[in-house]
Amino acid sequence: MAVTTDITATYRGPRKVIARLLAMGPREDRLLAFLMGACVLMFIAQMPRLAREAHLNGQELNMLLGGALLGIVFIAPLGLYALAMISHLIVRAMGGQGDGYQSRLVLFWAFLAATPVLLLNGLVAGFIGTGPALNAVGGLWVMVFFWFWVSGLIEAYWGNT
């Protein structure tokens, strides 16, 4: 299936999508594409907020975009790889059966699949600014991300795949 089709299917049933991705076999190139795609989309989601901040504070937009690009696209993937390793160790300590690939797949897919809500969060931050709407959309993104991540971990480590 196309990635966009899998993303929409994740909102209907995240465990089914993870099971299908796991059935494709381990491929690190696919994981890296998921991760980098999610990071690029996260960077794009930050653009409206950064443009608003630059306009309101009189800062240079290119400087803000450069810092966000460095942090999100180049440094954040390293942190996400470390988070995947830590979650793998925790799940294994809880009795889950699997390897590090499954943990990376689930985390990176949850991050990518939750990006539509993250893009909405960026629009709210850029057009409305701080306030209850931004908090609500940010909270929604966190809930969606954790729903996909935990459901995926359950499927990957305790499912029948």
Positions of PLM-derived features:
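N-terminal juxtamembrane cytosolic/stromal segments of multi-pass membrane proteins
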Residues: 1-40
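Interfacial loop-to-helix junctions that mark the boundaries of transmembrane helices
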Residues: 23-27, 59, 133
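Juxtamembrane loop-helix boundary motifs flanking transmembrane segments in multi-pass membrane proteins
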Residues: 2-14, 58-66, 95
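Juxtamembrane interface elements at the cytosolic ends of transmembrane helices
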Residues: 6, 11-19, 48, 149-161
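Hydrophobic alpha-helical transmembrane segments and adjacent short intramembrane/lumenal linkers
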Residues: 64-75, 80-161
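Membrane-helix boundary elements
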Residues: 48-73
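Alpha-helical transmembrane segments of multi-pass membrane proteins
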Residues: 37-50
